[in-house]
Amino acid sequence: MSRILDNELMGDEELVERTLRPQYLQEYIGQDKVKDQLKIFIEAAKLRDEALDHTLLFGPPGLGKTTMAFVIANELGVNLKQTSGPVIEKSGDLVAILNDLEPGDVLFIDEIHRLPMAVEEVLYSAMEDFYIDIMIGSGETSRSVHLDLPPFTLIGATTRAGMLSNPLRARFGITGHMEYYEAGDLTEIVERTAEIFEMAITHEAAKELALRSRGTPRIANRLLKRVRDYAQIMGNGLIDDKITDQALSMLDVDQEGLDYVDQKILKTMIEVYGGGPVGLGTLSVNIAEERETVEDMYEPYLIQKGFVMRTRTGRVATRKAYEHLGYEYMKE
């Protein structure tokens, strides 16, 4: 069974997200710093009749990087071609995509950190000088062919910016750090989703959902759907704060947005390791999760909310973690 607070896409959520996707910056809720910067850069590029500089969007899953890429293309009034790092297996695949671009087009590569190195190297000249050199034939009959490309904008999205090579990272003129959403912005997103799908919800219920959604719109919309189900079966269809609390309690999502896995991590740190420090590998083995899963999916939110600290000697549970789980804090 999938974890309700997983910030990766589940089931039909890609279709749902396309339905909810804003078209322009003015409609995009949250990420104000990124939006304000992009608005200036986009207007300047349009004023000069140039392609927008290559743009890197990075941050945890579910924060709207793909949506932002589509919004940028709409603001520029150009087409967007979408692909992802794992799909482009060899340089010939990328050459075919690049050769199909029209002047000013946006090429969006999701999970760009997963591009094979041979493919990435083809991007260097394409991004910097809008050309590629490709080899045709093999052996003694092989020859290099120079192929000019129209000016285009590459938008790369990644959850692991640190995994990008320095040469690739240096070729992005614009970077946007997508951060966890404030509760007010998430409340607005929940109310917008409810309106689009004709769900009856009170403002207080929307606020409660926002507070428990880990700062992530994808999770907020997923929880909203599950609370709607609960309201229709256990209530009269209205999503109010009481129904919301009952539904989220049933789903093991507490007032801080922690689920059973988060609580298991904190309890293990406190009960088994005295609050830490404990190494990430050791902790992962103890809770039977992959190290990368703990590091990428669980730990960022626990750190952001102040339940866990990273130290040079390992992870440490904070006073807030002790108090939240009802333990007496005895640390010096």
Swiss-Prot record:
SMART domains recorded: AAA (SM00382)
Keywords: ATP-binding, Cytoplasm, DNA damage, DNA recombination, DNA repair, DNA-binding, Hydrolase, Nucleotide-binding
InterPro entries: AAA+_ATPase, AAA_lid_4, DNA_helicase_Holl-junc_RuvB, P-loop_NTPase, RuvB-like_N, RuvB_C, WH-like_DNA-bd_sf, WH_DNA-bd_sf
GO cellular component: cytoplasm; Holliday junction resolvase complex
Region annotation (Head domain (RuvB-H)) ranges: 255-332
Listed EC numbers: 3.6.4.-
Binding site for DNA: R291, R310, R312, R315
Annotated residues for binding of ATP: L20, R21, G62, K65, T66, T67, E128, D129, F130, R171, Y181, R218
Quaternary structure (record): Homohexamer. Forms an RuvA(8)-RuvB(12)-Holliday junction (HJ) complex. HJ DNA is sandwiched between 2 RuvA tetramers; dsDNA enters through RuvA and exits via RuvB. An RuvB hexamer assembles on each DNA strand where it exits the tetramer. Each RuvB hexamer is contacted by two RuvA subunits (via domain III) on 2 adjacent RuvB subunits; this complex drives branch migration. In the full resolvosome a probable DNA-RuvA(4)-RuvB(12)-RuvC(2) complex forms which resolves the HJ.
Main function: The RuvA-RuvB-RuvC complex processes Holliday junction (HJ) DNA during genetic recombination and DNA repair, while the RuvA-RuvB complex plays an important role in the rescue of blocked DNA replication forks via replication fork reversal (RFR). RuvA specifically binds to HJ cruciform DNA, conferring on it an open structure. The RuvB hexamer acts as an ATP-dependent pump, pulling dsDNA into and through the RuvAB complex. RuvB forms 2 homohexamers on either side of HJ DNA bound by 1 or 2 RuvA tetramers; 4 subunits per hexamer contact DNA at a time.
Family classification: Belongs to the RuvB family.
Comment block on domains: Has 3 domains, the large (RuvB-L) and small ATPase (RuvB-S) domains and the C-terminal head (RuvB-H) domain. The head domain binds DNA, while the ATPase domains jointly bind ATP, ADP or are empty depending on the state of the subunit in the translocation cycle. During a single DNA translocation step the structure of each domain remains the same, but their relative positions change.
Identification of the protein by name: Holliday junction branch migration complex subunit RuvB
